[in-house]
């Protein structure tokens, strides 16, 4: 991570940290870096979610892009994966999404996609950051016909919707409850599932600029759980603000998280011989029950650090076509280059339809172990060296011995704060509490900030 770019672009409180001035510079410098080797006039797609700050940042960003001679296609409100899809299929130089994903409305973010539809590589982000920090802006300033042009492109939404529908199957007879988080999916999910002939019920479909992710969406599925029960829906589907992740609800109202969704789709692909290298890419935070279910099914796994960018990196480097996170980021590389909540939802419904099984039946193959995570404030200089402290290493080894293979412990530093994260999984809540609390007490004693 750099000074400006985090794991998912540039983020901050809109008009305070992520200002129009910064958005203009990101457009100008980002557009230049991503198009400097183009032989024809570069084309860049720009989209946003429904936040009140979106149009302000969009205007500034587009002005920056136009100032370096780029032809900008303005998509309006569109899901993040829609930008990725259009960049690839319309052969654009780059794409930009203005969104802070599952964060509240006061935040916003700007993330770039290269001409291959993937998020930027670290070296490209560092090149943009170098221009941001340069004492003087020395980039070309074209005039007259050298300036960029702006094209309103509402057709982009229709093309993305049509693509989504082509990946699905006829859902006649199926009732689907949707929660579009008052976000980007609110302009597309209804139409897509109606085109697939599903009966639908929808909440979180009335964005006002301030209510994105507010008590709705993948991080707040409680209303969707109630809607599923009230309507007798076969499944519920909750997206986040930019629709790059999905959390599902089965017909009984129970949550089906990313681990279970990935397993269900992975097993289906594996049985059809369509799972590349018969392997699923997941992160260190995936539940132990997920790993045991994969082992039972004979599916291999590749494990990465937390973050969908690391999952995608492993998929690209090793040729895998399915990966994701417990949080609901699911990447199906046969169709798109980034997490896509609506695409994942369609594939999940397809598995249900083609197997004739309910979502609760499909999800029951993964027994989710109780999981507890505690964040402990420690000396920043020690967070990466905790395992070098004998008392900490010894207590972790002791707890793992007691688990005897029927549980899991993960101790890792925060990437951004002076915190050590202690996580455990075990068959019962009482066991999880015991393992985490025992380790946490030793960590606090040895390297905690309060000592």
UniProtKB/Swiss-Prot annotation:
Its cofactor is Mg(2+). Coiled coil: none annotated. The keyword Aminoacyl-tRNA synthetase does not apply. Binds 1 Mg(2+) ion per subunit. The modification Phosphoserine is found at residue 101. It catalyses: alpha-D-glucosamine 1-phosphate = D-glucosamine 6-phosphate. The active site is at 101 (phosphoserine intermediate). This is Phosphoglucosamine mutase.
């Amino acid at each position: 991570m750099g000074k400006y770019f985090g794991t998912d672009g540039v983020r901050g409180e809109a008009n305070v940290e992520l200002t129009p001035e910064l958005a203009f510079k990101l457009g100008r410098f980002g557009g230049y870096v991503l198009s400097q080797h183009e032989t024809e006039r570069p084309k860049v797609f720009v989209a946003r979610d429904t936040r009140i700050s979106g149009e302000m940042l969009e205007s500034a960003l587009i002005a920056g892009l136009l100032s370096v001679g780029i032809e900008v296609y303005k998509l309006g409100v569109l899901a993040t994966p829609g930008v990725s899809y259009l960049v690839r299929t319309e052969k654009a130089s780059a794409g930009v999404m203005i969104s802070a994903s599952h964060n509240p409305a006061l935040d916003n973010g700007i993330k770039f996609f290269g001409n291959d539809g993937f998020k930027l590589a670290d070296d490209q982000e560092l090149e943009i950051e170098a221009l941001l920090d340069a004492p003087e802006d020395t980039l070309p300033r074209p005039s007259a016909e050298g300036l960029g042009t702006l094209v309103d492109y509402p057709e982009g939404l229709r093309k993305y919707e049509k693509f989504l529908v082509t990946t699905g199957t006829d859902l006649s007879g199926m009732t689907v409850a949707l929660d579009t988080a008052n976000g980007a999916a609110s302009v597309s999910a209804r139409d897509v599932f109606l085109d697939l002939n599903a009966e639908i019920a929808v909440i979180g479909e009335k964005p006002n600029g301030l209510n994105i992710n507010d008590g709705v969406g993948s991080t707040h599925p409680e209303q969707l759980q109630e809607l599923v029960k009230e309507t007798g829906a076969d499944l519920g589907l909750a997206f986040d603000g930019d629709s790059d992740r999905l959390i599902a609800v089965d017909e009984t109202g129970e949550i089906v998280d990313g681990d279970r969704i990935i397993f269900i789709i992975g097993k289906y692909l594996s049985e059809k011989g369509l799972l590349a290298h018969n392997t699923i890419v997941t992160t260190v935070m995936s539940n132990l029950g997920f790993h045991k279910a994969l082992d039972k099914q004979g599916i291999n796994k590749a494990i990465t650090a937390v973050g969908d960018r690391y999952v995608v990196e492993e998929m690209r480097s090793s040729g895998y076509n399915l990966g994701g996170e417990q949080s609901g980021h699911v990447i199906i590389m046969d169709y798109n280059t980034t997490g896509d909540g609506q695409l994942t939802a369609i594939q999940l419904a397809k598995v249900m339809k083609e197997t004739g099984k309910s979502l609760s039946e499909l999800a029951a193959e993964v027994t989710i172990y109780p999981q507890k995570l505690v964040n402990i404030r420690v000396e920043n200089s020690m967070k990466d060296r905790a395992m070098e402290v004998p008392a900490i290493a010894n207590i972790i080894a002791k707890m793992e011995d007691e688990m005897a293979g029927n549980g899991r412990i993960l101790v890792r530093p925060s990437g951004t704060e002076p915190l050590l994260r202690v996580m455990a999984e075990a068959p019962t809540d009482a066991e999880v509490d015991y393992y985490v609390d025992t380790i946490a007490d030793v960590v606090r004693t040895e390297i905690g900030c309060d000592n």
